[in-house]
Amino acid sequence: MAEVKKSIPKRRFVGKKNRKENNLDGSNRDVENAALVTINSKRSAGRVATQIPEDILNDKAINEAIKLLPQNYNFEIHKTIWHIRLRKAKRVALQLPEGLLMFGCILSDIFEQFCQVETIVMGDVTYGACCIDDFTARALDCDFLVHYGHSCLIPVDQTPIKVLYVFVDIKIDLQHVVSSLKHNLPSNSRLALVGTIQFVGSLNSIKDALQIQDEDGKGGFYVVIPQAKPLSPGEALGCTSPYIEKGSVDALIYIGDGRFHLESVMIANPDLPAYRYDPYSHKLSIESYAHEEMKSIRYSAVEKARTAKKFGLIQGTLGRQGSPKVLENLKNTLRKNNKDFVCVLMSEIFPSRLGQFSDIDAWIQVACPRLSIDWGYAFPAPLLTPYEASAAFNVVPWKEVYPMDFYATNSLGNWTPNNPENRPLPNRKKTGPVSS
């Protein structure tokens, strides 16, 4: 009997951590120190709700309450109060990721005081935009949901209750970002800027400042902000990132903390040198990823799954992670290949839980692709993504560049939710016959 400890990973597969090495120009400058310079740090006015009534914007009590929240975090309180009142909501659900959950009680108090509503703070884990829990909010008899910290991945016309997405833009030290990049990267380089949704609003200001050439010759960068629709320009998710045409830029610049979203962009663009600027620590670091090791591990799982006799199909139930249409497409693929399978609904997927299904030879999970990429080696049987399952049964060839297009509208095939084959038809108003 195998030891349990061996099946529990000490860390997830993250390639390699940041390292110090030569910069693009061959120098070995410390990428964590940069001199400050003065730039135009005007903030983008995008996403401002211009229709908010003046009596809400100028309400002294509301503005005093807002001061209880961090001033560099934009929780869009005025806009939220306006929407709650406009919709005549009675019970409002507040869904926040773990990093913002500490502000849940303050937000709840504000809306109960100024909107005369009952609020429910949803405390279940929220990993990303795919975890929006509109169905649970409806089951709790809520008529309005405010989802914080993520982009509008599930359109509001596809939710059973009214939903307001609040990105929670975070103000950062734009001067330090730009000076750090100008100090450490060769002038006139071609750069691609990406980040998480909290910092996407700052990317255009950073781009404008980087394109300016200073008197000392630094700067003058050619900067692009790539987009993977339906995401915002420059936005990266852990499973969906923009593909940047090979040779079009010299380096990738990621604005954000942590590596999870950055790794997605690096996987999609394996030939690009990558830098990460952490707005909290004010450090610029060179990042790397063990692409060949990751692809070798994943292809080995695909090869092993090809000989499996019985499959387990996991439909993720954490928020909106699962996709009934993707699941049905996978069922059809397994049927065509005469494979036996069983469907399992699961909110979170753990090795110990799947280990209880001793008769399953391989798994395919419609939840989070990164679960297989980062943790797949830790499971007792191959745990494939929908893309990997499609490659296993020759629906699509194995790609040299691992695709990170799970929510992209131009994805490779019907094993992704937003592929044209799987997208729901738009709601159209019925019209009567036209009289002549």
From Swiss-Prot:
Keywords: Cytoplasm, Iron, Iron-sulfur, Metal-binding, S-adenosyl-L-methionine, Transferase. Binds 1 [4Fe-4S] cluster per subunit. The cluster is coordinated with 3 cysteines and an exchangeable S-adenosyl-L-methionine. Its EC number is 2.5.1.108. Disruption phenotype: Sensitive to methyl methanesulfonate (MMS, causes DNA breaks) and hydroxyurea (HU, ribonucleotide reductase inhibitor). It is found in: Cytoplasm. [4Fe-4S] cluster binds at C130, C239, C368. Signal peptide: none annotated. GO terms for biological process: protein histidyl modification to diphthamide; regulation of cytoplasmic translation. GO terms for cellular component: 2-(3-amino-3-carboxypropyl)histidine synthase complex; cytosol; nucleus. It holds the Pfam family Diphthamide_syn. It catalyses: L-histidyl-[translation elongation factor 2] + S-adenosyl-L-methionine = 2-[(3S)-amino-3-carboxypropyl]-L-histidyl-[translation elongation factor 2] + S-methyl-5'-thioadenosine + H(+). Residues 1-27, 417-436 are annotated as: Disordered. Its cofactor is [4Fe-4S] cluster. The keyword Iron-sulfur applies. GO terms for molecular function: 2-(3-amino-3-carboxypropyl)histidine synthase activity; 4 iron, 4 sulfur cluster binding; metal ion binding. Pathway: Protein modification; peptidyl-diphthamide biosynthesis. Residues 7-19, 426-436 have a biased composition (Basic residues). InterPro entries: DPH1/DPH2, DPH1/DPH2_1, DPH1/DPH2_2, DPH1/DPH2_3, DPH1/DPH2_euk_archaea. Component of the 2-(3-amino-3-carboxypropyl)histidine synthase complex composed of dph1, dph2, dph3 and a NADH-dependent reductase, predominantly cbr1. NCBIfam families: diphth2_R. Belongs to the DPH1/DPH2 family. DPH1 subfamily. Catalyzes the first step of diphthamide biosynthesis, a post-translational modification of histidine which occurs in elongation factor 2. Dph1 and dph2 transfer a 3-amino-3-carboxypropyl (ACP) group from S-adenosyl-L-methionine (SAM) to a histidine residue, the reaction is assisted by a reduction system comprising dph3 and a NADH-dependent reductase, predominantly cbr1. This is 2-(3-amino-3-carboxypropyl)histidine synthase subunit 1. It comes from Schizosaccharomyces pombe (strain 972 / ATCC 24843). The gene is dph1.
